[in-house]
Regions:
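ATP-binding pocket architecture of kinase catalytic cores
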Residues: 1-84, 122
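An alpha-helical support segment within catalytic cores of ATP-dependent transferases
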Residues: 61, 65-73, 80-81, 85-128, ...
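Short, polar/flexible loop-turn hinges at active-site or ligand-entry regions and domain interfaces
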Residues: 31-43, 97-102, 171-173, 222-226
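All-alpha amphipathic helical-bundle segments outside canonical DNA-binding/catalytic cores
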Residues: 74-77, 195-206
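Active-site acidic catalytic loop and adjacent metal/ATP-binding pocket
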Residues: 56-57, 115-162, 169-176
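A general structural signal marking secondary-structure boundaries and capping sites
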Residues: 5, 53-67, 93-97, 121, ...
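Active-site activation/catalytic loop segments of kinase-like enzymes and analogous catalytic loops
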Residues: 87-97, 158-193, 204-223
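Single conserved hydrophobic/aromatic residue that forms the stacking wall/gate
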Residues: 227-243
Length: 243
């Protein structure tokens, strides 16, 4: 990211054996916090986020060097991985509301529908995808916009990060704002983009991503990490995606 003039944390130290790295601290002035401020210019904040996304998507290098100077090829965000992520919905969330008797057949149908959606993706996997491009990972630092949590980036569909930002579960936004953000992306991105295909993939990947998030929240709730009230269900539902 940094070599491509993207403001991202510098890596200072590492200990791969102990799963430890030390990175630059950008503070906590996230776009999420700025959006929640009274009188904030929401569309301007989102436009700046889209500007950054466009710059990230211009990165074409697929082989990079890690901290040890070893070459590392960024993996492809294949449909198989997308399926496994979306399947978290049936693995963890569906079982909370479907009887044990019906659950096997329900899960079969859910997984069938996931595969159907993925089979209808049209855009080639040739864009750097952050995978968590949302308002909590975007930080204003020294009057510039920075991106954090970049370690899981893959080469995938250009619509994925766009869906992550616009249909973000962390910040509720109305349809008008969502449409304005989406149209701004179309305006400043590559003119060769097929608008029909982009919208198709955007909608599919938004569903897939939110299924993954619901599954993750359900799994965390089961392990008592998301309880915000005496009722586990209340704690879970308070964080259910709103998009």
């Amino acid at each position: 990211m940094i070599k491509n003039k993207i403001l991202a944390p510098k890596l200072y130290k590492e200990n791969y054996k102990e799963n430890f790295i030390e990175i630059e601290d950008f503070g906590d002035e996230t776009i999420f916090k700025l959006l929640r401020k009274r009188g904030s210019n929401k569309i301007n904040l989102y436009k700046k986020s889209i500007d950054l996304l466009i710059e990230i998507q211009k990165i074409k290098k697929k082989i990079i060097k890690n901290l040890k100077g070893k070459k590392y090829q960024v993996p492809i965000y294949e449909n198989n991985k997308l399926f496994k992520e979306a399947k978290l919905f049936s693995d963890w969330y569906a079982k909370k509301y479907i009887s044990k008797k019906k659950l096997p057949m329900v899960n079969i149908e859910i997984n069938r529908q996931i595969k159907f959606l993925l089979s209808n993706l049209k855009i080639k996997n040739e864009t750097l995808v952050h995978r968590d491009f949302h308002v909590s990972n975007l930080i204003r630092h020294k009057k510039k916009l920075a991106i954090i949590d970049t370690q899981d980036a893959l080469i995938g569909n250009m619509a994925y990060d766009l869906a992550s930002l616009i249909d973000d579960v962390r910040f509720k936004s109305n349809k008008k704002l969502k449409d304005n953000i989406y149209n701004y992306y179309l305006k400043i991105s590559n003119d060769k983009i097929n608008k029909i295909i982009l919208l198709n993939d955007f909608e599919i990947l938004s569903v897939i991503r939110n299924m993954k998030i619901i599954g993750i929240f359900a799994r965390l709730a089961e392990s008592c990490l998301l309880y915000t009230s005496p009722s586990p269900r209340d704690g879970l539902l308070s964080r259910m995606p709103s998009s």
